[in-house]
Amino acid sequence: MELVACVDARPEALEAACDAGVITARQCYPSIGDAIEDQKTDAVLVTTDGAQHGDVVRAALRARKHVLVEKPFVESMAEARELVDQAAALNRTLMVSQNYRFFPAVRAAQRIVKGQELGQLLHVDIDFRRFAHVSHRLHWRHPLLLDMGIHHFDLMRAVLGREPRTVDCRACNPPWCGYSDPPEAAAIVDFGDGVTVSYRGSWLHPERPTAWAGEWLMEFEQGTVTWTSRGDRSGLRSAEGDAVSVYRHGTVPDRIALPHLELFDRAGALDAFTRALAAGTTPESTAGENLGSLALALGAIRSAECREPVQLMTSANSR
């Protein structure tokens, strides 16, 4: 993999990339059209603001490039389906970088659920707490439920191996906090067959912050599992802070060994993308697969706005 061009409408951003030694001035462009026309490229990495994702992804696909796009994919289901269909029609890979999947604690939790190592899963509690009263986040669209919550909603689907059926959410925006949209929320997500997830998230907690993936407690027939992932010191080759503990009924807690991963986080997502392109296979978290996570995030927002449960379409029938 080689970085051949950098696109940004802001000259100061391109200058900063050059100063950092990431790229040369000859490889900097003000628009994706200019870059694609001038450079030989196989794929495009889209890291713009979420509201701009659709236009940039559309332009890259139109030029027959594979695309890896930052989460959240886009801000509406209609646009998401349009881009998924466009990628399929052009036989291009379109993947969403749900980078929280690429951590060892997540893989261990997936294995425990899939292998029914403690019997059937019954219920999950997830808590996310951070204090992020910073100016650039105050005016983001739904800084918790969409921008941050998309990570947690995607992990629910990835770890449980199920699709959500309904979501009932309430959000809070205290008048003193300065956010345009609610920075706190609580939700109950029904995954069918008696499996529910209780989710609580907040950007207003200065004390006892959780890791970025949150604190998970999973209740099974034969015990419970607690885990957390993506601590503050996590990096491209580090998963410091990842931990999984298993509590079988009648036994002492056991902090289990975690699976080995070569790369983590965004590097893990990028590696999965490039490996899939090289092998001609389908990567994890394609845009089509990601429809379920986006539908859950947007459904939680709708539920919070109308203060009623919202029925969700699964990824199997959302097309």
Describe these PLM feature segments.
Residues 43, 49-50, 54-101:
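Beta-strand-loop-alpha-helix segment that lines the small-molecule cofactor/substrate pocket
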Residues 153-234, 267-279, 317-319:
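Contiguous beta-strand/loop segments that form the cofactor/metal-binding neighborhood of enzyme cores
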Residues 69-70, 94-96, 125, 199, ...:
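Hydrophobic residues in well-ordered beta-strands that form the structural core
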Residues 25-32:
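Conserved SAM-binding strand-loop segment of SAM-dependent methyltransferases
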Residues 100-179, 185, 307:
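Predominantly a Rossmann-like dinucleotide-binding segment in NAD(P)-dependent oxidoreductases
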Residues 1-23:
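N-terminal Rossmann-like dinucleotide-binding module
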Residues 43-45, 81, 192, 237, ...:
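C-terminal helix-rich "cap/oligomerization" subdomain common to oxidoreductases
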Residues 9-13, 258-270:
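Active-site loop of classical SDR/Rossmann-like NAD(P)-dependent oxidoreductases
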